[in-house]
């Protein structure tokens, strides 16, 4: 793509916003430019910037992210700022939080959750609030209102073999300005169970001698004063493998794997190997196995971590531009991809194999007889090999699905900007599965003309029959390594 950036009245796309940031940093780091020099060259220097963005894929992503039919409901949050001068000369400031409190306490809407059913309903509430605040003769110094369509979404699609970012979308709804919040690259959100793969199971397989058949006990589990449960409740299942832990997103299996085999320190180290840069020392805890992080992660970095798995364990820094030429056609920067081996190819394949099961119809039965199903079947795409992992945070504040095919890796985040829990039913603000449908719809369209080569099995993979209960090589007639004791 030959791009000459100019200031204009049409807001840049989310991709262009990130491209500007990436090019600016490259000009500063590689050529020694100041912020001002880089900006002047970028917008007025006649640069030719070549990007790997795929216009057709980008169009598909934008269409599906903004298609109302892909959402169970549409509601609106408000970013509100109001400054008043009271009759006594005092200046006071108000926000969406004070508006929410007023609606709950003064207007009797105790159940108001910060979301409105329409823009008109939101504006009516704002008008009433302003009127109530100015009844004493206070005057308005300034006011700003931004309506935000909820639930929000971000999407990232990467070609894992090259690191080329083919498309991103930083939020649904009309983009009204340049360099606004880009939920795909700027927002740090809790990753939930997607992080089990990165911080617990990947290092266990890669560095600690575990296999997909290594077993951990799914039962009551606590650390310090914190008690952990599985996402389906307190109905435990006994001994289960790492493969089961991934397929059914078993919290206790992931926690015991980190505690007994990996250690939180190694878990954080592996997440950083896979390109997660937002971790801090306080994240060296067991909660990291479940994605309970201090700051959270960006969609771009989380998706790219899975792209490394899809690429046989080779991490490639995300590429938004391939080269920059000056106005005379001279190459200023040739952006060669930065790569490193983050995982063994055997580890990457084992994780891929287990995450294929996530997207297939599998059911595991609890001791009470109730069924727990694999968590990614809604996202499965027809006639194409795919592997992935879902993630949901406490109270359904964030929902994720990150997965890949032999061609592309894609990640979707869903949630409300104001951290309102996602709900279904009669008070729906989006539900907790819409993101998987969007992921499936986008990836189905992207792969329509592509054949399915399957996932390549590396030469380093060896197969063997193992005891299902112990994860060890079986003994003919009896499994003497069964953790419950010999038969």
Predicted regions and their residues:
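Non-catalytic, structured segments within soluble enzyme domains
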Residues: 1-96, 272, 277-278, 287-291
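Conserved catalytic neighborhood of penicillin-recognizing serine enzymes
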Residues: 5-9, 209-267, 327-357
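A penicillin-recognizing enzyme superfamily signal
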Residues: 51-74, 78-89, 93-147, 151-159, ...
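C-terminal substrate/ligand-recognition segments
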Residues: 148, 153-159, 165, 197-201, ...
